[in-house]
């Protein structure tokens, strides 16, 4: 029934198994990949006919995690998986980016790659396994895919590289890098690093490329046994139409691409395009070529004109040379009520970035396969259509916005202060108000400035720069701080962020079949120079965090209490903690370790809450005299609030030196008194005395009373440790039960 084919190999000290022929047999390609005990299913389905009227390759990648993979039931009301999580979106992009350039040019059939996590051992992250499985499924499917690709995660531990580190090892590593590529070249890099050098980063990329070669070889062996017949597809011949278009528009396109203002340049290019379409696709008469082919050829002509000009003259669209960064203006404190804000402008790219500080209550709960955890640093990136002078959809963030936000998050996170030094939840929001290339890196620069404006003590300022590439045969040019057109018409988008000490984040997307180590080395060196220049420009606004938090930011006071006192601070059903919050106005967060965080923008509120909690957890000293207030009168004595929130009992025998017949004859509720703390009994009940304290002066008169008794010839009274408990007895029926128990009934 099943024609199962398998390939196994030991990879990074663990077994990798690729299997096909048993699961999802109606898909064009299906592979189950298992690494350790993490298992994913990757499927590929491509439409039988091309999609009409489009000039792009319609590829969709969906990565989905199932809660059962980790033996969990989803949270929420419906108890089933819902919209994609942030991680699912990011891994979908991670799979998409290295495979998209490898489809044959002109492929217009809807193609969908679906990767489902079936089992997760909580040690091997499913993302690398998913990339490998997707590559294998595409290679088997028969679609025109020039793969396979391999992928690997690289860590940097104790001065050495680690292939596919476990989840626990990644947390300890100074590098988390994912690299993907073919046998010959690197296609994609995604990483977060703790200020590592360019040499270490490049070494990690090449280390990963070398060590995923056995995976590519295993996929090839599997394809030799199980691949389907290749689709009958030939790339369209467009040489004639491309020549006709270029003959008409080359000169005018060159002139249009000398216009430095983006909107004016776009108008000029659109005018040239309209002229070409009118010439080759007239409304009346014979059309030499279809409008779709002419428009596609015009796009190719745009690319050729821009690329030739850069390679031949070294001059770019806006007149810069390949290494020059656009003019930069950095401003901070631009929003009066925000905790921290900045407006970062680089050429025609602009980001308004705002930092907000919160308490532990504001941390984000993330429900992942590994379990639920809290995240204290959030970075959100918004790209409204007006930023490029267009109308468009508004609403929840798309994949691009989530991906760009995560890239900026990775760039800034390594320089944040640890939570025990700066116990705030931090949210950064980047509003892209203008865009002409590299808006994610503008978010990094603006985010760094806004955090320093808010008083967040970053280890060092962070800047980011986007590098581009023009590659024609043996000739290439690496471009610093690329424009949007250079991104669209070029071969690479290589983003590098870091401090003056090293790289914190690196992302590379290649639109061709890969780049060499030499090109990456040149790009990293050029990016380092550009990053240093940008940091210098940012320093004109701020060089370090402000010494004080923003005027409207909350202040947080941290205190440590004994863990056995947490219950006392919270109270029954949260009664006490709610009362503290309501009366002081402060926010309070108590951790299981006994760490208490008190937050408010009002210093007096923090002090009041701090003293209140301290009074609950602090212990009075035996023999010490305290001021107190009568809070309740009983037949057997009076309860006194005497030590912050602590109450204790003054037994009727301890109210006055003389015999007291009725408690109300001596004290009234609300009366201010002075009491001596006698201690606590074995049940923790607090015993107090008024009779041994001079209520006028607060003096301890114990010895004076002893002397008076001695003069009267009265015997010395022995202190009874349980006298304070006599009035705390239960109802008569309870006492009767105790007597019956003692008599053996």
From Swiss-Prot:
Family annotation (SMART domains): KH, S1
Superkingdom as given in the UniProt entry: Bacteria
Keyword RNA-binding: yes
InterPro entries the record matches: ExoRNase_PH_dom1, ExoRNase_PH_dom2, ExoRNase_PH_dom2_sf, KH_dom, KH_dom_type_1, KH_dom_type_1_sf, NA-bd_OB-fold, PNPase
Domain S1 motif: 623-691
Main location group: cytoplasm
Cofactor(s), by name: Mg(2+)
Reactions catalysed: RNA(n+1) + phosphate = RNA(n) + a ribonucleoside 5'-diphosphate
GO MF: 3'-5'-RNA exonuclease activity; magnesium ion binding; polyribonucleotide nucleotidyltransferase activity; RNA binding
Localization per Swiss-Prot or TrEMBL: Cytoplasm
UniProt region (Disordered), positions on chain: 695-745
GO biological process per UniProt: mRNA catabolic process; RNA processing
Primary enzyme class: transferase
Keywords: Cytoplasm, Magnesium, Metal-binding, Nucleotidyltransferase, RNA-binding, Transferase
Residue ranges annotated for the KH domain, each copy included: 554-613
Keyword Hydrolase: no
GO cellular component term, pick one: cytosol
UniProt-listed Enzyme Commission number(s): 2.7.7.8
Binding site for Mg(2+): 487, 493
Function noted in UniProt: Involved in mRNA degradation. Catalyzes the phosphorolysis of single-stranded polyribonucleotides processively in the 3'- to 5'-direction.
Family: Belongs to the polyribonucleotide nucleotidyltransferase family.
Name assigned to this protein: Polyribonucleotide nucleotidyltransferase
Gene this chain is encoded by: pnp
């Amino acid at each position: 029934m099943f024609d199962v084919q398998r390939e196994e190999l030991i990879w990074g000290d663990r077994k990798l198994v690729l299997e096909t022929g048993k699961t999802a047999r109606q898909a064009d390609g299906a592979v189950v990949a298992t690494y350790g005990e993490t298992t994913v299913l990757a499927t590929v389905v491509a439409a039988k006919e091309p999609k009409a009227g489009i000039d792009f390759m319609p590829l969709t990648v969906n990565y989905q995690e199932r809660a059962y993979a980790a033996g969990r039931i989803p949270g929420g009301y419906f108890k089933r998986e819902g919209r994609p999580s942030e991680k699912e979106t990011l891994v979908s992009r991670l799979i998409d980016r290295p495979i998209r350039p490898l489809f044959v040019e002109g492929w217009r059939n809807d193609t969908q790659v679906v990767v489902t996590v079936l089992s997760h051992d909580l040690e091997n992250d499913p993302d690398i396994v998913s990339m490998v499985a997707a590559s294998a499924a595409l290679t088997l499917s028969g679609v025109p895919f020039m793969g396979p690709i391999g992928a690997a995660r690289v860590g940097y531990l104790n001065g050495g590289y680690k292939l596919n580190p476990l989840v626990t090892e990644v947390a300890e590593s100074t590098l988390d890098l994912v690299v993907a590529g073919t046998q010959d070249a690197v296609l994609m890099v995604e990483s977060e690093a703790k200020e590592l050098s360019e040499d270490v980063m490049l070494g990690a990329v090449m280390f990963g490329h070398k060590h995923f070669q056995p995976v590519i070889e295993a996929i090839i062996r599997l394809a030799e046994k199980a691949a389907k017949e290749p689709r009958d597809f030939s790339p369209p011949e467009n040489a004639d139409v491309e020549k006709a278009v270029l003959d008409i528009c080359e000169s005018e396109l060159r002139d249009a691409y000398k216009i430095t203002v983006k909107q004016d340049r776009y108008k000029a290019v659109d005018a040239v395009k309209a002229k070409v379409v009118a010439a080759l696709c007239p409304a009346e008469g014979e059309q030499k070529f279809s409008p779709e082919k002419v428009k596609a050829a015009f796009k190719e002509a745009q690319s050729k004109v821009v690329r030739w000009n850069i390679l031949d003259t070294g001059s770019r669209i806006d007149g810069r040379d390949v290494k020059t960064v656009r003019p930069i203006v950095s401003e901070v404190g631009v929003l009066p009520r925000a905790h921290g804000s900045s407006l970062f402008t680089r050429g025609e790219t602009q980001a308004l970035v705002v930092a907000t500080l919160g308490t532990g209550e504001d941390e984000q709960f993330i429900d992942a396969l590994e379990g639920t955890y809290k995240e204290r640093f959030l970075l959100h990136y918004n790209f409204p259509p007006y930023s490029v002078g267009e109308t468009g959809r508004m609403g929840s963030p798309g994949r691009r916005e989530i991906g760009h936000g995560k890239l900026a998050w990775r760039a800034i996170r390594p320089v944040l202060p640890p939570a025990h030094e700066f116990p705030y939840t931090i949210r950064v929001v980047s509003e892209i108000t203008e865009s002409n290339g590299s808006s994610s890196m503008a978010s990094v620069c603006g985010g760094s400035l806004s955090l320093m404006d808010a008083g967040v003590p970053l280890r060092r300022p962070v800047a980011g720069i986007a590098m581009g590439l023009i590659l024609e045969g043996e000739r290439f040019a690496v471009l610093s701080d690329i424009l949007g057109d250079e991104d669209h018409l070029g071969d690479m988008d290589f983003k590098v962020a870091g401090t003056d000490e090293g790289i914190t984040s690196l992302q590379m997307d290649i639109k061709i079949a890969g780049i060499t180590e030499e090109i990456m080395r040149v790009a990293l060196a050029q990016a380092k120079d550009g990053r240093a220049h940008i940091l210098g420009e940012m320093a004109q606004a701020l060089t370090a965090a402000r010494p004080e938090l923003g005027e409207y930011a909350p202040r947080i006071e941290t205190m440590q209490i004994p863990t056995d006192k947490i219950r006392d601070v919270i109270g029954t059903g949260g009664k006490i903690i709610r009362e503290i919050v309501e009366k002081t106005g402060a926010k309070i967060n108590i951790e299981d370790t006994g760490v208490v965080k008190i937050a408010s923008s009002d210093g007096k509120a923090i002090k009041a809450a701090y003293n209140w909690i301290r009074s609950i957890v602090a212990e009075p000293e035996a023999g010490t005299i305290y001021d107190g207030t009568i809070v309740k009168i009983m037949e057997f004595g009076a309860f006194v609030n005497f030590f912050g929130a602590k109450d204790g009992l003054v037994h009727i025998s301890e109210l006055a030196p003389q015999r007291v017949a009725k408690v109300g004859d001596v004290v009234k509720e609300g009366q201010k008194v002075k009491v001596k703390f006698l201690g606590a009994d074995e049940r923790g009940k607090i015993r107090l005395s008024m009779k041994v304290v001079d209520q006028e002066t607060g003096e301890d008169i114990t010895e004076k009373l002893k002397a008076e008794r001695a003069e009267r010839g009265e015997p010395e009274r022995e202190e009874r440790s349980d006298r304070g408990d006599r009035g705390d007895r239960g109802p008569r029926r309870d006492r009767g039960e105790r007597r019956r128990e003692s008599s053996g009934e």
